[in-house]
Design a protein with these regions (language model features):
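Active-site helix of classical SDR
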Residues: 22, 30
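Residue(s) in the substrate-gating loop at a strand-loop-helix junction
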Residues: 6
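Alpha-helical segment proximal to the catalytic Tyr-Lys
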Residues: 35-39, 98
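Short C-terminal tail/terminal secondary-structure segment
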Residues: 11, 90, 101-116
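Short, flexible catalytic-loop segment of classical short-chain dehydrogenase/reductase
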Residues: 10, 27, 44, 48-59
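Active-site "substrate specificity/gating" loop of NAD(P)-dependent dehydrogenases
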Residues: 12-16, 38, 116
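A glycine/serine/threonine-rich, flexible loop-to-helix segment
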Residues: 39, 51-74, 114-116
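A conserved structural motif in NAD(P)-dependent oxidoreductases
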Residues: 74-85
Length: 116
């Protein structure tokens, strides 16, 4: 199982409290189910994207000031692509990750690790 969380579940971003709380709950559910279902051979992981270029984000990213703010907070200095999230999900479904469970993989260009 691969859940789709968000960096909002791990730190404050301007998506609102309800969104952040729901993603934090999903991250915790991932960890708990990974432990509960491990004996049955079920792995449960999560991906946590930061800014990903999609139809939903295109309007916000079209604003040069907002785009610059996103880039300034992203060590890789770019937004992610949907294919990169899909590749992370695919990895978590492959035998190559057979010993990985309970993890929330940030697909965020380093956003969660970036300090001031």
């Amino acid at each position: 199982i691969v859940n789709v969380g968000s960096v909002s579940g791990a730190t404050h971003v301007r998506t609102g409290a309800a969104y952040g709380m729901s993603k934090a709950a999903l991250h915790q559910l991932t960890r708990n189910l990974a432990c509960e279902w491990a004996e049955d051979g079920v792995r449960v992981n999560c991906v946590a994207p930061w800014y990903i270029r999609t139809r939903r984000t295109s309007d916000a990213l079209a604003d040069p000031d907002y785009y610059d703010e996103v880039i300034a907070r992203t060590p890789m200095r770019r937004v992610g692509e949907a294919e990169e999230v899909a590749a992370a999900i695919a990895f978590l479904c492959l035998p190559a990750s057979s010993y990985v469970t309970g993890e929330c993989l940030a697909v965020d260009g380093g956003f969660l690790r970036y300090g001031f």
